[in-house]
Amino acid sequence: MRHCINCCIQLFPEDAHKQQVACQGGPHHSHQACPSCKGEDKILFRVDSKQMNLLAVLEVRTEGNENWGGFLRFRKGKRCSLVFGLIIMTLVMASYILSGAHQELLISSPFHYGGFPSNPSVMDSESPSDVKEHHYQPSVNNISYVKDYPNIKLIIDSIAARNEFTTRQLPDLQDLKRQELHMFSVIPNKFLPTSKSPCWYEEFSGRNTTDPYLTNSYVLYSKRFRSTFDTLRKAFWGHLSHVHGKHFRLRCLPHFYIIGQPKCGTTDLYDRLRLHPEVKFSAIKEPHWWTRKRFGIVRLRDGLRDRYPVEDYLDLFDLAAHQIHQGLQAASAEQTSKMNRIIIGEASASTMWDNNAWTFFYDNSTDGEPPFLTQDFIHAFQPEAKLLVMLRDPVERLYSDYLYFASSNKSADDFHEKVTEALQLFENCMLDYSLRACVYNNTLNNAMPVRLQVGLYAVYLLDWLTVFSKEQFLILRLEDHASNVKYTMHKVFQFLNLGPLSEKQEALMTKSPASNTRRPEDRSLGPMWPITQKILRDFYGPFNTRLAQVLDDEAFAWKTT
């Protein structure tokens, strides 16, 4: 069968390539363009039983379709455009159907060893006002995440099956000394008996024109604290003790440490506690010396630099040391042995958990577990140190941590995907290493897109309890602190053996607004998806249960928050 491409009329006979016939193009057909009207040969198009191109089919009309003339009078260009649009639409829909349902499961490649950590260097905390989350806003992606839950649950179950809270092997004192020869040469074995803080006098060999802070690394790398050190520099010579032509300066370490955790309210605790007249903190809120600066880590993304000597760390307590020195001098003049009640504190929220630098300095001879931890060195010098810990539901802590440190593209969807990726990476490590090895694995911590490991409180606390007694800890919950600030602060005062406050001082401390609240732009993002929350509760559940057992307090299981 043959047809006219111009007017689609049927032509006979079948074997002819050119034929003259009468025009049947209809009233609107252009007879000047039709070969039949002009007596010209008609151009034929063969239609057979073979599969035909889609565009060619639209240019052919078979018998009995004359009623479709109105549709077929579209220009060929418009018809082609319509067909191309339909094809593209079909391809897009087919692509979504084939791959869309699975794309949320596409996570990064398995665990690999990488370079130096790139996690944020600032370890800050969360305030009580951020404990409550915003109302839930549904998302299309949340539906597909729910469908993915069984697969993610398998990962969580795999991790839980390998959780073993084993006892770590403790290093002896000689091993510690070999690692930090200079530190052990600077800090003495005994401290002044008349000071609550661990202090001692050391000889200063410089002149009155000598700048004692000239080479301090905290000054060199941070412009923010130069004014503080300028003040210290001007008053330095007047706070020396002069005996038999020699000059001595008072050196001090903290009496207590706020050791963690980040995004759990440590900043708020710090701000309220420093209002007490008997408490003095370091010149910098979070020196991060024990965990980072003594290894030469200024910012994690910058890699290693020169190590900060212990003298630079001790300089941070000179303001407090000056006040303690004045009190000691006054007591000496009165010939009394009255205890100086000023205590020094330090509030680096990385102290409890961050041991990422160990792989660069210590021999890996313990199956991936660090042979030395931060608490080993603190205990070697200060076996009677007091330790404050503020904790929070680790599920909410992780989301707050994500909102604080993520720089762009923050959303509940992005958080869910990062959590899923981090869980897979953690499982991959657990397939080959112990729980402790994975928790302290620098490469893994660097690879995970969210700091999943920071919420494993039980692992860290159990390791701290290998060197310090439980009585040396005061462990608080942010949820309790948020609901009753006055009560938690009184517990802190009692733990640190601080004197009572006046009514005015107490009102100022308890009624001050919360510190370091969540940024407005982060609040507008709302909470995490319920399915993400469920996944994290499943993951952290066994660790929370163990923590509650250690502390003998079910509140730390966070079963209801």
Swiss-Prot record:
InterPro entries: CS_Sulfotransferase (IPR052654), P-loop_NTPase (IPR027417), Sulfotransferase_dom (IPR000863). Inhibited by phenyl beta-GalNAc(4,6-SO(4)). Glycosylated. The lineage of its organism: Eukaryota, Metazoa, Chordata, Craniata, Vertebrata. It also transfers sulfate to a unique non-reducing terminal sequence, GalNAc(4SO4)-GlcA(2SO4)-GalNAc(6SO4), to yield a highly sulfated structure similar to the structure found in thrombomodulin chondroitin sulfate. Its EC number is 2.8.2.33. It holds the Pfam family Sulfotransfer_1. The chain crosses the membrane at residues 81-101. Glycans are attached at residue 364. It comes from Rattus norvegicus. GO terms for biological process: hexose biosynthetic process. Residues 1-80 are cytoplasmic. SUPFAM superfamilies: P-loop containing nucleoside triphosphate hydrolases. This is Carbohydrate sulfotransferase 15.
